[in-house]
Amino acid sequence: MSQNDLKIDVKALGKVAVLMGGTSAEREVSLMSGGGVLQALRSRGVDAHAFDPAHSDLSELKAHGYSRCFIALHGRHGEDGTVQGALELLGIPYTGPGVMASSIAMDKIMTKRIWRADGLPTPDWRLVSSSAETAQAFQELGAPMIVKPSREGSTIGLTKVTSLGQCEQAYRLAAQHDPEVLCEQFIDGDETTCPILGQGTEARALPVIRIEAPQGNYDYQNKYFTDVTQYHCPSGLPEAEEREIQRIVVQAYRTLGCRGWARADIMIRASDRKPFLLEINTSPGMTGHSLVPMSANASGISYPDLCLRILASASLDALQGRAGAAGGRESV
């Protein structure tokens, strides 16, 4: 897909701020994502500039004449609705979901509650506030069990617990990052991820990526800084399975009221091939190791054109009227 095929008037995009860095635990990855996006947009003739909220107040965006923002921030104070809320007040359109959808998606427990209420499959879970409650959750959910902060990304603070004796340490690690700790039933099977682009009934899933990590250890280091993890796109899954994953992620995206773009993580249980939603990322990575560019490329969208397409979708909640927030079940 070329820039001409996208039919985007680059000049009409105006002066663009690529928000990167920030103050979250994912700052380093955000700087890599933002650097890639910045270079890509400039290669397409966009008047794009780096902007780090850790060093500059967001109010400066208005003062310096920025007309829209590409959010390449990850984690807290980046994809949790706070920056989105500030940009709403400034009246500067931004990429990705709005305030409410961003804040909900950042909270894994709230996300799972909403998905479960809409009939979407997600692993059983417990919200815990102590190591004793973590041990109780382990007895109820069984082994293995995943323990992780409710509001962090990139597997930060995550532990795969295989014995009762690991519960205390796993809880302490997760609680360092968030007082709300999620214990989740582990799904043994294929790990996959699937990006979504668009809004409402126009939202569409890109090709599914199947992930093979060493000993199933798809952690922060393996995600961004090594080449030991293998990514399969095409996924190699049966066509019916891939289409079902795409259908589920689009429904999950729409149920939360997302717009612009996101990426959902899904496990396929080996015993019966049933897919389970784990979480949705509303400001996915755009590094050299990132998965949205890989999937987009498989569907014929280059990295620069992907960045341009996402930027062109920048909007404000005030312009949406909550359009596309209803769940609904859409085919892909």
From Swiss-Prot:
Belongs to the D-alanine--D-alanine ligase family. It comes from Acidovorax sp. (strain JS42). Residues 112-312 form the ATP-grasp domain. Cell wall formation. The gene is ddl. This is D-alanine--D-alanine ligase. SUPFAM superfamilies: Glutathione synthetase ATP-binding domain-like, PreATP-grasp domain. Pathway: Cell wall biogenesis; peptidoglycan biosynthesis. It is an enzyme of class 6 (ligase). Mg(2+) 2 binds at E279, N281.
